[in-house]
């Protein structure tokens, strides 16, 4: 009988561990600039040029502008990386921003940097704001203004009335400035809020959305930003109507705060 020699033992080889591939930032962080436009044909080209120089795509929302302004927007939208959305009639700054946020998401962007078309925002801070947004993708990256001598004193002092109401309506000092529109929105949670609640469509929008995002515990990061009011700048603030809308907005938020007061106070005690 033939005897079979046993096979030599097989030396076990260590199994190499494979680290999971980390997602490339470019795969999930896709920011754009969102610019609501209403008859800003003089200042808009320079704003778009500065943002495109930073390699940031731009979504222009024409909020019922004049034919002259619409022509400028059409010409800018011929550039690569510049998109436009047009409202047949003016809906107000808030309405333009809301439409722009939805359009940005439809185009595949993850975040939107809101920029005013009148040139008052210091765009040298774009890179810093986007860097912070990539580090904290769920946070709203909010600018709080550093004014120069060009700021109208009446407008500056009037802001403090809104600051006080925001602090009351959040039971917190966390929101440093709710009126500066230079901020980066994470689109997913922002649009989820806009799908649930109808917010103000005009000058009341910037403040109301921050208060409601605070209520839902959305993280916020605050960065200083320089603000300059051009001597020939275009303002569409309507003294009586917009102040009435802002007052009504504060009243709505106050009622909402009363309903949420136990939760808001409990949140403060936990910190």
Q: At which residue positions do the language-model features occur?
A:
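Hydrophobic helical membrane-anchoring modules
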Residues: 2-28, 196-271
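Acceptor/aglycone-binding surface of glycosyltransferases and processive sugar-polymer synthases
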Residues: 89, 94-106, 123-203, 230-237, ...
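Acidic helix N-cap motif at the loop->helix transition within catalytic regions
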Residues: 42-46, 67-76, 124
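Short beta-strand-to-loop acidic/aromatic patch adjacent to the donor-nucleotide binding site
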Residues: 109-120
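A conserved acidic beta->alpha catalytic loop
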Residues: 62-71, 119
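Short beta-strand/loop segment that forms part of the nucleotide-sugar
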Residues: 56-65, 85-87, 115
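Cell-envelope/extracellular polymer assembly enzymes that use nucleotide-activated donors
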Residues: 30-32, 57, 208
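Short, well-formed alpha-helical segments that are part of the catalytic scaffolds
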Residues: 17-22, 38-53
């Amino acid at each position: 009988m033939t005897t079979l020699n046993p096979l030599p033992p097989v030396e076990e080889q260590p199994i190499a561990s494979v680290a999971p591939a980390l997602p490339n930032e470019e795969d999930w962080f896709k920011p754009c600039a969102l610019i609501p436009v209403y008859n800003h044909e003089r200042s808009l080209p320079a704003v778009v040029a500065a943002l495109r120089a930073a390699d940031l795509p731009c979504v222009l929302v024409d909020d019922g502008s004049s034919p002259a302004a619409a022509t400028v927007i059409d010409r800018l939208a011929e550039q690569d990386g510049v998109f436009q959305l047009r409202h047949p009639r003016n809906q107000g700054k808030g309405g333009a921003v809301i439409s722009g946020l939805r359009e940005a998401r439809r185009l595949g962007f993850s975040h939107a940097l809101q920029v005013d078309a009148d040139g008052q925002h210091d765009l040298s801070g774009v890179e810093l704001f986007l860097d912070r947004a990539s580090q904290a993708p769920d946070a709203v990256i909010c600018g709080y203004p550093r004014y120069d001598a060009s700021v109208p004193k009446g407008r500056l002092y009037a802001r403090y009335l809104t600051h006080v109401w925001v602090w009351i309506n959040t039971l917190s000092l966390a929101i440093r400035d709710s009126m500066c529109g230079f901020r980066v929105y994470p689109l997913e949670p922002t649009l989820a809020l806009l799908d649930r609640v109808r917010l103000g469509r005009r000058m009341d929008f910037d403040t109301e959305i921050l208060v409601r995002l605070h209520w839902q515990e959305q993280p916020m990061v605050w960065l200083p930003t320089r603000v300059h009011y051009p001597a020939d700048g275009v303002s569409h603030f309507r003294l009586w109507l917009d102040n009435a809308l802002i007052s009504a907005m504060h009243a709505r938020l106050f009622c909402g705060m009363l309903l949420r007061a136990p939760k808001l106070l409990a949140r403060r005690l936990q910190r």
